[in-house]
């Protein structure tokens, strides 16, 4: 319960930053297009800094075991998410964007600052498993959903700055290559901005949406229910039955971090790729915005249930 309360407090802080981002646009100091500048900073500077800094730790058997578990969990969880997405697409006649939003979560932008605040920066390394698997699927499975078959670009996958930063971090971790203290501290300082910047971007995007249209859209609430409540409950049952949280070592915390990544709102990447590939970007933004606002209630509840059951 303590973790759930800490989570609720941190998500509330991030939600207030979302409202600040909305206020900047509503007051006409900025417009929603300016969010692209912050998105570029987050994608190409802040996120890589977080991942490289996360791997600047001692190479120990416990950490290796935790990393292996985080990658394995990421693969298993994504298999389940994709399977559930297909099932719900059929049952609820979801369109492409609704389908994508049920499968892909905002794990990087939201989970990293939450893990840093609740568990400490030394635990951020265990978010890398979920992020690297998800990033690979963004440019393969998600791209296929939005564009159709025959549109994979492996060069794009392998040269993605976030994938490269994880590879660099893993390489330095494996060979225990330590950055100079001043550089590592600089990366840590930049990385600390990931939550506020991501939430400002979210607020700026939400401010440009037609709120009346969103509030009256039953489909958006259906997607929010699937993404934030039903799918997390199904995954929670899987964690409970499998007993993976009780493997020993750091498994309990690693599994909790991985589960946290699956209960977060719809991925901002779905919105960004919808813009690029000619899908309904306004609808994608609406789903992203509503699930981001509602997660302040649903995420602490899911973590409280997790701690009570597991």
Question: What do the PLM-derived regions correspond to, one by one?
Answer:
Residues 1-310:
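Alpha-helical transmembrane segments of multi-pass small-molecule/ion transporters
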């Amino acid at each position: 319960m303590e973790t759930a309360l800490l989570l609720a407090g941190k998500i509330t802080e991030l939600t207030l930053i979302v409202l600040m981002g909305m206020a900047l646009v509503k007051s006409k100091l900025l417009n929603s297009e300016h969010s692209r500048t912050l998105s570029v900073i987050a994608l190409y500077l802040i996120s890589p800094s977080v991942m490289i800094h996360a791997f600047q730790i001692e190479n120990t058997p416990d950490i290796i075991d935790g990393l292996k578990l985080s990658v394995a969990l990421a693969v298993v969880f994504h298999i389940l998410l994709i399977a559930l997405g297909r099932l719900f697409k059929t049952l609820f006649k979801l369109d492409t964007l609704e389908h994508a939003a049920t499968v892909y979560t905002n794990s990087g932008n939201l989970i990293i600052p939450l893990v840093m605040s609740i568990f400490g920066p030394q635990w951020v390394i265990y978010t890398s498993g979920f992020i690297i698997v998800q990033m690979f699927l963004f440019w393969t499975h998600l791209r296929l959903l939005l564009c159709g078959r025959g549109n994979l670009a492996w060069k794009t996958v392998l040269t993605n700055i976030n994938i490269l930063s994880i590879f660099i971090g893993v390489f330095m971790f494996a060979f225990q290559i330590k950055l100079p203290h001043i550089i590592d501290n600089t990366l840590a300082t930049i990385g600390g901005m990931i939550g506020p910047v991501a939430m400002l971007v979210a607020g700026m995007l939400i401010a440009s949406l037609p709120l009346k249209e969103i509030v009256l859209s039953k489909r958006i609430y259906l997607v929010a229910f699937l993404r934030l409540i039903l799918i997390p409950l199904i995954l929670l049952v899987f964690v409970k039955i499998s007993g993976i949280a009780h493997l020993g070592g750091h498994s309990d915390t690693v599994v909790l971090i991985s589960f946290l990544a699956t209960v977060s709102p719809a991925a901002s990447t779905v919105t960004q790729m919808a813009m690029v590939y000619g899908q309904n970007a306004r609808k994608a933004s609406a789903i992203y915005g509503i699930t981001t606002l509602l997660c302040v209630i649903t995420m602490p509840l899911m973590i409280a249930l997790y701690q009570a059951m597991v």
